[in-house]
Amino acid sequence: MARISLHDFSPADVNRGPWIPTSLSNNPRAGQWSSERMSQGMVADYKRFLMTDGEGIRCSLYVSGCPFHCVECYNESIWDFRAGYPYTQKLEDQIMEDLALPYVQGLTLLGGEPLLNTGILLPLCKRIRSEFGNTKDIWSWTGYTWEELMRKGETPDKLELLRYIDILVDGRYMKNLHDSLLQFRGSSNQRIIDVPKSLENPSEPPVIWEKLHDQERFIPSIYGKDRASGEGDAS
């Protein structure tokens, strides 16, 4: 597969992570980055039965490779598309076996950048829908914003994968917008998007997941009640 070159990056220089030359950026033009050119078919990790990567008990697949390179990304060790190990039929069969368990709600796609690994993920998601229908949900994180994915000229495989995804957490991680009270996100620019509802009107702003409940909405009032009752006083 072709190696990434300077031409794979736009000339702007916004929110670069470490080790990114000043001529490179994490703001790609429409269609500039593609799975066909960049993915090496590698995965970094597969984790079973987690409750941190979306709603309910989930299995999580971490694909390798991400050119967004966000500042203080917690997964910078797998920015390289060659990191990790090859995705195999054996791993796919294990994922399907785990998803068949009645207490597992669904699969989460992370990375790395899932939408630049569609060669792996499209067949997997198609198999999930074929064998489980909509009884198992699919979540995904992406560095792309919804608006970037909907713009004219973006590679069609990204939209094809989106059609199998139920919930998308979109946008780069922005260090200056970090908020530890956000649900399933690291920075306040990111959104939890209901993909099927949003695709009904792709030219409109995306529909936010109806179960969103950021902790910052509730903690101040709870803290105030605790203070009024004397809980937490040093005395």
Where are these regions (language model features)?
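Cys/His/Pro-rich metal-binding microdomains
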Residues: 64-67, 71-74
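P-loop/Walker A phosphate-binding loop and immediately adjacent motor/lid segment at beta-alpha junctions
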Residues: 119-129, 178-227
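Receiver (REC) domain switch/active-site residues of two-component response regulators
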Residues: 166
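Conserved Radical SAM active-site core
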Residues: 39-44, 57, 72-161
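N-terminal [4Fe-4S]-dependent radical SAM core
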Residues: 2-62, 75-81, 214-217
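Short glycine-rich anion-binding loops that position phosphate/pyrophosphate groups of nucleotides
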Residues: 114, 173-174
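Short secondary-structure boundary segments
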Residues: 142-143, 171-173
